[in-house]
Amino acid sequence: DWLIQSFLSPISNQRTDQYGGNWENRARFPKMVLQRIRDKVGENTIIEMRFNACDYVKGGISIEDAAATIDYLSDVVDIIQCTGGSMDDPYADVFSISLGPMGHAINAWSAEEMKKRIKSNVIIETVGGINEPALAEQVLAEGKADLVAMARSFIADPDWARKAKANHAEDIRPCIRCRRCLTTSTPEFCNRSRCTVNPARTLPVK
């Protein structure tokens, strides 16, 4: 889990000082980091934060604490990208695999919960298991999120957005969520992620 999220989750944050305990203490360090960023970039620069609205693990951050944290950070952040999962549990670490039980748009429900609960005007974004334009449009049309983000879909097909805009969804080379791009982005592989469906992401045979 990344540094800021490790403070926000009660699973990873076991501190007993002012940076641990209740949600406000756990959000103290992230708020300090975001405030310093805001001070440096000014009010005219958009700041987006990736945020676990659910850890998918017993004892993880609650929906109530997640919403309260977003409101607490709302004066120093513009967009919250709602994701989920945890490396502390094998199931929670593989929830985005295509063969897993969670399906597509797996974090849209938590983004929707954040939109319902927060009192601030922070833009809520969802990410995870959204690899078709129609699904992205559905999530937005149903009001589950203000924005939709994706990453691996663009590794599979860098022209994803262009094809979607041209209404050629059938030509999109879909991400199959096999995680090869994640398991090969290591120094041993020259820091170049591979892709099962995109041969351009594979080093040429010598």
For each feature predicted by the language model, list its residue ranges.
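Flavin-dependent oxidoreductase catalytic cores
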Residues: 1-206
